[in-house]
Amino acid sequence: LVGRVRREEIPNAYYKAASIREAIDLPLKKHKVPESERQAIIGNLFAHFDLTSVAREPASALDSEKRHLLAIAAALSFSPAAIVADEPTKGLDEVASARVAKALFSYDKQVVFATHDTDLIVRPEYAIGRVLVVDDHRVVFDGAPREAVDFYTDLVRSKYEAAKGDRA
């Protein structure tokens, strides 16, 4: 089982639930997870992702950081072997991005993610060991984070220079 964190942050259905606790509980209930187990799962996830204080709030009342954290908590609710995340810190400022990344990478699950945030991949506390750079649907680099950032920076610069030359 793989948990998925969508770029849109949280599924639209979560906005229909009366609270974010209910939004996480409904899929668990649908899969016949016993009540006591559901409450333990939700309690643990909400504590880890600092969502306990807003558990009774509707998703629409959450700020962007809390919506990102909720998306990760939702992806983990069925205890997947790994998490696949598309831009898990997209649209967040540096402080919120760091909090979301810390929560994501500290949950003891393998994380595969797409990002344009080069600062994120080189932070030693996240222990990212391998980075793939994809360009035009092809892997063009496979290696260590620092080297990936250098490669990506050069790639973007060369594309910018080529585009600038095309306009001249």
Where are these regions (language model features)?
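Hydrophobic anchor residue at the start of the ABC signature
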Residues: I72, V100
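Conserved beta-strand-loop-alpha-helix hinge in the C-terminal portion
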Residues: R138-E161
